[in-house]
């Protein structure tokens, strides 16, 4: 839906349901490295939704917004490996059941400002889904901001980007005992040469 040269709104939803044999999952060990484990049967299913909005704010000004939300259970349906095996019927370790993203890009001529927000639900660290102090990782949010400038020359197109990651210096873990970096900064320079384009334009 939308109005020409004013705004456009679109969206969708997808459902998936997969029964997977011989799923390989990598889990951390006490020695500090990851080791593969084979799961005979995994039931992965869920829904993913997305929405996109474009708004023309005025001459040379444009706002793009995208949002996604995912519900993705991944359940171990293998046979128990032993009488003490409590992993059957449980969510796979380190796989969030819920996740979401929202991005917004404000553009003016060759400048753009990008804001990205991410959410990940709690993740279990054990196949038994024990709700103990070290048995799960709490949910976390992540906020990133990027300023970008496009430059064009005869010989190449340049893209200059400066990013602030983890804008609010959140404490978060993606793997047990391995904290993710706090607020940090990145600079990108992209160069796209225009080989042969000037010669072709003269003909």
Model regions: which residues?
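Extended alpha-helical regions
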Residues: 16, 20-27, 42, 169-172, ...
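C-terminal beta-signal and adjacent terminal beta-strands/loops
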Residues: 118-128, 136-141, 147-203
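Residues on the lipid-exposed face of transmembrane beta-strands in outer-membrane beta-barrel proteins
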Residues: 1-3, 47-53, 102-108, 115, ...
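Short, solvent-exposed coil/turn segments
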Residues: 32, 44, 65, 97, ...
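Gram-negative outer-membrane beta-barrel transporters
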Residues: 5-20, 37-124
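Generic detector of contiguous secondary-structure segments
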Residues: 29-40, 99-102, 127-135
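Outer-membrane beta-barrel translocator domains and adjoining extracellular loop/strand segments
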Residues: 23-32, 76-85, 116-117, 124-132, ...
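Alpha-helix initiation/capping motif
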Residues: 2, 38-40, 93, 133-136, ...
């Amino acid at each position: 839906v939308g109005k020409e040269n004013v705004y456009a709104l679109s969206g969708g939803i997808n459902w998936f349901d997969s029964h997977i044999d011989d799923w390989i999952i990598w889990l951390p060990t006490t020695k500090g490295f990851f080791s593969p484990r084979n799961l005979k049967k995994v039931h992965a299913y869920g829904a993913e939704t997305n929405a996109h909005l474009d708004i023309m704010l005025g001459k040379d000004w444009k706002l793009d917004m995208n949002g996604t939300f995912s519900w993705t259970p991944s359940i171990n349906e293998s046979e128990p490996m032993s009488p003490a095996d409590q992993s059957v019927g449980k969510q796979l370790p380190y796989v969030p059941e819920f996740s979401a993203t929202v991005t917004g890009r404000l553009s003016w001529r060759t400048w753009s400002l990008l804001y990205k927000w991410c959410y990940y639900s709690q993740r279990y660290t054990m196949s038994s889904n024990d709700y103990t102090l070290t048995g799960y990782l709490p949910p976390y949010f992540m906020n990133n901001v990027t300023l970008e400038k496009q430059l064009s020359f005869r010989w190449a197109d340049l893209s200059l980007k400066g990013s602030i990651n983890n804008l609010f210096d959140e404490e978060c873990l993606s793997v047990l005992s391995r904290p993710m970096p706090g607020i940090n900064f990145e600079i990108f320079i992209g160069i796209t040469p225009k080989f042969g384009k000037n010669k072709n334009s003269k003909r």
